């Protein structure tokens, strides 16, 4: 992030990281740089720590995948393939965008999985 801020001293619109930890780290690195006050910091994975960072005002949003649906659709496609059926080239397993409005609900949902 230091390199980005050095190369773009006037700020940029969005930082889109490959995962939540990288997005949170980038947001924290830019925290004291006023040129980045309006930058959107986006992570991927929908981790509890990212949702908490959203509630704390550190991260703008994250995108959460649904691992159950990803696995289910993968097995479903494999069965279709093994049965000689045509398999879609692209299979969308869905996602959820987690923002300040939905972060607490997302945290509660993830925590409920470990309570079962």
Describe each model-derived feature in a short phrase.
Residues 1-116:
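A residue-level marker of the well-folded mature domains of exported/periplasmic proteins
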């Amino acid at each position: 992030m230091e390199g980005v801020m050095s190369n773009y001293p006037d700020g940029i619109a969005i930082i889109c990281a490959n995962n939540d930890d990288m997005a949170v780290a980038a947001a924290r690195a830019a925290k004291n740089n006023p040129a980045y006050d309006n930058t959107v910091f986006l992570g991927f994975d929908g981790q509890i720590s990212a949702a908490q960072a959203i509630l704390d005002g550190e991260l703008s949003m994250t995108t959460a995948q649904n691992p159950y649906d990803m696995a289910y659709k993968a097995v479903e496609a494999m069965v279709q393939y093994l049965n000689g059926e045509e398999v879609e080239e692209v299979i969308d397993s869905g996602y959820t965008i987690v923002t300040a409005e939905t972060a607490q609900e997302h945290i509660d949902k993830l925590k409920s999985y470990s309570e079962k």
